[in-house]
Amino acid sequence: MSKFYKSGRVTTAVIVALSLSACARFDARTQANGDFDYVQTPRGEHYQTAHFTQNEARDIYDIPALTEQQKRIGFLSSNVDIRPPTQLIPVIDGVVLEANNSDKTTVLFNAFNHTENMKDKVWTLLESYIAANNIEVAAKDSNLTQIETGMFRHQQAYGSFLFRTKVVRESSYRFTLNQPQGGQNAALTVEVLSYSEKNDNVDLKVNLTARSKKSIELRLVNDLLKYAYQLKESSELQVANSQPLPIKLGYDDNNQMVWIVDADFIVSWTKLPDLLALLRFEQVDADKNLGYYLVKFKAPNAKYWPENNLNSFELDNAEYFIQLGELNSGSTSITWLDADKKPLADEKVTEIYFSITSKIRDVLLLNENQSKAL
């Protein structure tokens, strides 16, 4: 009974601790731990040396009083935002943050060739980004390449499902695009015009000054760059889908028998599922970061192979790992592994390869060629 009581008491303590941690409001998460009673502590009086001289007294350790501007920014107690400043995340090449003393945030987009008009590209990207987010354009001057936006609204939940809090951020911005003299580069300046935060409909204190202002502007820049990256990736996938998938037998950098695709990883990753489906491999799982497909083979009837311009091959009805790797040449290796991640025999890898006839290899793998019923 004693052991049961202690166990129950520990369980209760854990539940209470989790509840307290989960109940923390968003604004409390931006503050240091503990109370702020120290601000009420009276300052000590200067040490009196009686009739001795105070010529050696130093004020180096005296705490200076806050200026009015520092008080507005929030340099005291609970007003101090302990979150680290937002950093630029350059997910696309050629983007750097301009170092300046301005209270505005400027990002440079560098061109990689002399024929590239980066200013026009960034302007088009900016218009597309605003439209994709359904943001109203409050003012626009094409001659000055300047846009003022309506409200961006971003909602995010914090905490566990039992103690979830909802934070809503609303903000508007001015974008100004310039082109430095003597170059094809573009400089995008972002200035936040208004910003507010609510935690479960309760207004939070926000200071649009110094580090806080720059963090807000950089968060938007990072979201813009993320959008640009997604557009770029989508465009690359469209190009990949219109290109053939040339495959040959060979060896990887570890001298392992593999299929080699004369294309980069993105192209190979995108188009390989169509080929695997044609060979009667059903996708079970996939992890792009680790570069593998987990597939399950189900042997078709004898008519399937000639109907789909394939040579038959024998393989156990089981699960297999298809591991993709990037070779030094820029090509992609495809390694065949069994369910225990052991390489298939070279003869079996070769047999599966030769099931792909010349009518299929090096041509576009169209969906209509893969959907014939058994």
Curated annotation (Swiss-Prot):
The gene is bamC. Disulfide bonds: none annotated. A lipid is attached at C23 (S-diacylglycerol cysteine). It is found in: Cell outer membrane. Belongs to the BamC family. GO terms for cellular component: cell outer membrane. One of its GO terms (biological process) is Gram-negative-bacterium-type cell outer membrane assembly. It is a lipid-anchor. A lipid is attached at C23 (N-palmitoyl cysteine). Keywords: Cell outer membrane, Lipoprotein, Membrane, Palmitate, Signal. It comes from the Bacteria. InterPro entries: BamC, BamC_C, NlpB/DapX. This is Outer membrane protein assembly factor BamC. Part of the Bam complex.
